[in-house]
Structures are given as structure tokens and as C-alpha cells.
């Protein structure tokens, strides 16, 4: 800044700018520029979508031997964000747009292609009519025929609209609403009838059960008592057995008599005539033989089991038989 404002540059009197040598650069040299994708595209290599407005560091070059009205055409090189494949496109000053050249396909291009096709057909038709007068008559005949078909279709649409105009949509909706309400009312009545029938059936069943219970509670006195069936004992459920404790198994029950005690019949001792006459019985002499019953008395304990009593009874019978 100080040099521009304060100091002056010196130009010698023999200064000639044409004599200064210029740097020779190739015409197809490339520059690195920062740009955004001008349209939506899809990579042909990996199928990755690249949307419009995505920024790239692109290489820019001038297309050789392609000029439109003196305007140069530029080519740009970018790389796919996924597979790093090279994609190229160039400017189109004729249509103020860009054209895809290599590496990708342009999306949403159907409308543009259709417009280009229409322009091409129109141009070919104009070229044919320019050199062939008969072609002009044929094209006019085709146009008039197409126009008549369009008018017929338009008339059909008008008739259809008129027929639909006479239809009262409000009345149709009202009728549909009434039919729906009637159907809902009928369904509600059927539900009520079914509920009433179920309640009536339940009430009758309850009355029958009450009458049966009254009949069972008050039997008729004239009816004779039924005798028990002899085989009814087989149908009875078995009674639960009392759990026998360990001490009862070893010692025996003290409070109740065992069931086999009924089988043991205790004999009554015969009255001795000597004792009945009042004379005392003589004491046995020492060394005299005594019967087995007196030698081996079997005292009965109140807590003895039934099996021990039965064994003692059998021993007493054997001793009596031997005597």
C-alpha cells in the first residue's frame, strides 16, 4: 500500500511492452476450480446418486474446436463420492444448460427429451413442407381430422357433465344415511330381543332349580324308606386312614382296643371244689411237677397287642391238651 501511494515506478524511455517475452502455456491446460453439481446425476459405476448443489473440486479445461457463436465451451471433471470414478460434463450455451458427457446419467431428463423430440419433429415437418406442396395438403388433412376427434371427445365430456348435473348428490347421501340408521336400529332391536330371550331362559332355569330343591328338602311321609342296597358298600368312597405313629407301631395303642382283640375269647376259670367247700388248697410240694400253664404264666398287659394275646391263648390251649 505504501509503495502504491508514495513511490513512483520508473519507466525507461525505450520501454516496449511487446519486447517482453510471454510465458508459453498449452492451450488445453487445466485449472482447479470449486463448483457445484449443476443437475442430479447417477454414477454408472456404483449407482451412487449425486444431487444438484453438491460441491466438488473440479478440473476445468477449454474444449478444442467447439465454439457456439464465438463463445468457448468448457469441460469439467469431477469424481464420484463413493467409487471415485471420473465424471465429465460440459457447458451448453445454446440452451443455457449443461450436458452430461461421460461417467453418469442425468436424472429427471424425460421432460427435456420430450421437448427436444417435439422440436425435432416440428423442424422435420417444416423442412418437408418447404420442398413438397403435396405434403402440405396431407398435413392439413391430418390436422383437420385430429381436430374433429378432439371436438367429438369434448362433446362427449360435456354430455357426461350434463347427465351428472341432474343427479342430486345430497339426496343420495341423505338416502344412504337413512338406510344406515334403519339398519343400525334393526340391529339394536335384534340384540334386545336376543338379550330378553336369554334372560327369560335363565329365569325359567332358576325356577326349575328352586322347585327341585324344595322337593328334595321336604320328602313325602307316605313314601317308604328305601332299604340300603347290600352292594352299596362297594360304591362308597374309602375312608381316609389315620396315620399310625412310630411309637404306636412298637408299643401299641393304649387307649383303644385293637381290631383282632375281638377274636380272642378269654376263658373263665372253673371254680375249684376244694375252695368252694371252704378247705384251703394244699401247697404244692417242692420238686413236684407242675403244669406248663403254672410254670409259664402269661400275664396280660393292658398295652399288649392283639397278636401277643392270640399267641398266649394258643399256648394255653396246647398246655391243656397235653394234660
UniProtKB/Swiss-Prot annotation:
Transmembrane segments: none annotated. This is Splicing factor YJU2. Component of the spliceosome. Present in the activated B complex, the catalytically activated B* complex which catalyzes the branching, the catalytic step 1 C complex catalyzing the exon ligation, and the postcatalytic P complex containing the ligated exons (mRNA) and the excised lariat intron. Identified in the spliceosome C complex; in the complex interacts directly with PRP16. Keywords: Metal-binding, mRNA processing, mRNA splicing, Nucleus, Phosphoprotein, Spliceosome, Zinc. Residues 278-290 have a biased composition (Low complexity). The gene is YJU2. GO terms for cellular component: nucleoplasm; U2-type catalytic step 1 spliceosome. Part of the spliceosome which catalyzes two sequential transesterification reactions, first the excision of the non-coding intron from pre-mRNA and then the ligation of the coding exons to form the mature mRNA. Plays a role in stabilizing the structure of the spliceosome catalytic core and docking of the branch helix into the active site, producing 5'-exon and lariat intron-3'-intermediates. May protect cells from TP53-dependent apoptosis upon dsDNA break damage through association with PRP19-CD5L complex. It comes from the Eukaryota. It comes from Homo sapiens. The keyword Metal-binding applies. Its main location: nucleus. It holds the Pfam family Saf4_Yju2. Belongs to the CWC16 family. YJU2 subfamily. Coiled coil: none annotated. The modification Phosphoserine is found at residues 211, 213, 220, 316, 319. It is found in: Nucleus. GO terms for biological process: generation of catalytic spliceosome for first transesterification step; negative regulation of DNA damage response, signal transduction by p53 class mediator; RNA splicing. Zn(2+) binds at residues 43, 46, 80, 83. GO terms for molecular function: metal ion binding. Residues 207-323 are annotated as: Disordered. Residues 236-246 have a biased composition (Basic and acidic residues).
Amino acid at each position: 500500500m505504501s509503495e502504491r501511494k508514495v513511490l513512483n515506478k520508473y519507466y525507461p524511455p525505450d520501454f516496449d511492452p511487446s519486447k517482453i517475452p510471454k510465458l508459453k502455456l498449452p492451450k488445453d491446460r487445466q485449472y482447479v476450480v470449486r463448483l457445484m453439481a449443476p443437475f442430479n446425476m447417477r454414477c454408472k459405476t456404483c449407482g451412487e446418486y449425486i444431487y444438484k448443489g453438491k460441491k466438488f473440486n473440479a478440473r476445468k479445461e477449454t474444449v478444442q474446436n467447439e465454439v457456439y457463436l464465438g463463445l468457448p465451451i468448457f469441460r469439467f471433471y469431477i469424481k464420484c463420492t463413493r467409487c471415485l470414478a471420473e465424471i465429465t460434463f460440459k457447458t451448453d450455451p445454446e440452451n443455457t444448460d449443461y450436458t452430461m458427457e461421460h461417467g453418469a446419467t442425468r436424472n429427471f431428463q424425460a421432460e427435456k427429451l420430450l421437448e427436444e423430440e417435439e422440436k425435432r419433429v416440428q423442424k422435420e415437418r417444416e423442412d418437408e413442407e418447404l420442398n413438397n406442396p403435396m405434403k402440405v395438403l396431407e398435413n392439413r388433412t391430418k390436422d383437420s381430422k385430429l381436430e374433429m376427434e378432439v371436438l367429438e371427445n369434448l362433446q362427449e365430456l360435456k354430455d357426461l357433465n350434463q347427465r351428472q348435473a341432474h343427479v342430486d348428490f345430497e339426496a343420495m347421501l341423505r338416502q344412504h344415511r337413512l338406510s344406515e340408521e334403519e339398519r343400525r336400529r334393526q340391529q339394536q332391536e335384534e340384540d334386545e330381543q336376543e338379550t330378553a330371550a336369554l334372560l327369560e331362559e335363565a329365569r325359567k332355569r332358576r325356577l326349575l332349580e328352586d322347585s327341585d330343591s324344595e322337593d328334595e328338602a321336604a320328602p313325602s311321609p307316605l313314601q317308604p324308606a328305601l332299604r340300603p342296597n347290600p352292594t352299596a358298600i362297594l360304591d362308597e368312597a374309602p375312608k381316609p386312614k389315620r396315620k399310625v405313629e412310630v411309637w404306636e407301631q412298637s408299643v401299641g395303642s393304649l387307649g383303644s382296643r385293637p381290631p383282632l382283640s375281638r377274636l380272642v375269647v378269654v376263658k373263665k376259670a372253673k371254680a375249684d371244689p376244694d375252695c368252694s367247700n371252704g378247705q384251703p388248697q394244699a401247697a404244692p410240694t417242692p420238686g413236684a411237677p407242675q403244669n406248663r400253664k403254672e410254670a409259664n404264666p402269661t400275664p396280660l398287659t393292658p398295652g399288649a397287642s392283639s397278636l401277643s394275646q392270640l399267641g398266649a391263648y394258643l399256648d394255653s390251649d396246647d398246655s391243656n391238651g397235653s394234660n
